[in-house]
């Protein structure tokens, strides 16, 4: 039916199914032409409303449209725990609505939550590939739980220190005996390195999910590491070498740390080499006393430069040169006098001042009276302006 025929049928009020079937089989170009042939705004609005309410077209044959299947949600660890331990013998006589709270209490204190997370992830991976019908959950747990030494439903309450009782209302309750030895023991393989792929490989070896094909190009998304419990084991692990195969992130971090350590070592070594070079150069400039040990070289990876350093040459000159007996930079103030009241002018030469000081009357060169063991009656030197008592 062409567009003109469709417009003519609209005038005779055709059935809704016929209109929908016509609109579903139109192409985009035909729909544009159809809107151009309907000039009235009310008719265009009615056609637009009909297009919005159309059901999706179901195509047959090789042109059939198939919507992409959404990824299924992974099985929750608690749900897996509940599915396995709902068969505890003490719970069989009670409906599920009265057991939900009890199983929740068991889950809160269960020591094997990490193992349940691994098991449910492994089963979810199998289910997503081969389907739920070919991967029964109860069969999966019946294979993997005994392998991981998980407590069986028949012995779970006794192993973990739980006891079941009936309250006044006739409902089941559980109580935990924290003082019992079994309450403090984790039943799972806490000392085993385990991954999702390890679990899948084991159940497949037991004949479960034989059609499942693991992707060899991807690593396991979840890994349960080894639990170190003894001091000797901790010391052995501390001295162990780095694993040959490490994640890409760990390899990048290790390489970055090595580069930083190398830069720090080069920096420290360079400063030490420069300091040793300066010390050796100082020894070269001033060999020291005869017989004093002087190393030929210092253990340093850097080459030593034996050229004299001006700073140390000047420093050695300051300490080795005699102290001069002149004051070229000293200036006398006007009207200055010596101790014996001898006037001194700021124009007097320094050489003349040395003579004045040497020939001053107060200057005494005989100090025999002050030597050790001198006569106590010795005559002290006299001064012109001071009378001896």
UniProtKB/Swiss-Prot annotation:
Entry keyword Transcription regulation: yes
Any one GO biological process: positive regulation of mating-type specific transcription, DNA-templated
Cell location: Nucleus
GO molecular function, one term: DNA binding, bending
DNA-binding feature ranges: 70-127
PROSITE patterns in alphabetical order: ALPHA_BOX (PS51325)
Keyword Nucleus included in the entry's annotation: yes
Family as reported in the entry's similarity comment: Belongs to the MATALPHA1 family.
Protein name: Mating-type protein MAT-1
């Amino acid at each position: 039916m062409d567009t003109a025929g469709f417009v003519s049928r609209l005038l005779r009020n055709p059935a809704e199914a016929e209109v929908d079937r016509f609109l579903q089989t139109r192409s985009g170009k035909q729909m544009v032409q159809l809107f151009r042939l309907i000039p009235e705004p009310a008719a265009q609005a009615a056609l637009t409303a009909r297009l919005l309410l159309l059901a999706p077209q179901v195509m047959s044959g090789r042109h059939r449209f198939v919507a992409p299947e959404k990824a299924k949600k992974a099985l929750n660890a608690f749900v897996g725990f509940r599915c396995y331990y709902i068969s505890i013998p003490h719970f069989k006589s009670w409906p599920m609505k009265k057991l939900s709270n009890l199983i929740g209490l068991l889950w809160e204190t269960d020591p094997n939550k990490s193992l349940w997370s691994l098991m449910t992830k492994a089963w979810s991976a199998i289910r997503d590939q081969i389907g739920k019908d070919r991967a029964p959950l109860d069969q999966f747990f019946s294979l993997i739980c005994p392998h991981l030494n998980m407590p069986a439903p028949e012995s779970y309450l006794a192993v973990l220190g739980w006891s079941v009782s009936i309250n006044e209302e006739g409902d089941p309750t559980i109580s935990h005996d924290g003082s019992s030895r079994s309450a403090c023991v984790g039943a799972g393989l806490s000392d085993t390195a385990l991954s999702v792929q390890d679990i899948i490989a084991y159940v497949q070896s037991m004949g479960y999910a034989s059609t499942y094909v693991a992707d060899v190009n991807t690593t396991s998304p979840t890994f349960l590491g080894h639990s170190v419990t003894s001091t000797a084991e901790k010391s052995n692990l501390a001295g162990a070498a780095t694993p040959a195969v490490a994640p890409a992130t760990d390899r990048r971090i290790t390489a970055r740390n090595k580069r930083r350590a190398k830069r720090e070592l080069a920096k420290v070594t360079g400063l030490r080499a420069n300091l040793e070079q300066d010390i050796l150069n100082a020894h070269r400039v001033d060999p020291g006393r005869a017989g004093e040990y002087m190393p030929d070289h210092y253990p340093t990876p850097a080459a030593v430069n034996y050229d004299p350093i001006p700073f140390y040459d000047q420093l050695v000159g300051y300490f080795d040169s005699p102290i001069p007996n002149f004051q070229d930079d000293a200036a006398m103030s006007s009207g200055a006098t010596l101790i014996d009241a001898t006037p001194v002018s700021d124009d007097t030469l320094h050489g003349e001042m040395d003579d004045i000081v040497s020939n001053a009357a107060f200057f005494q060169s005989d100090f025999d009276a002050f030597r050790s063991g001198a006569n106590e009656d010795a005559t002290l030197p006299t001064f012109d302006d001071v009378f001896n008592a």
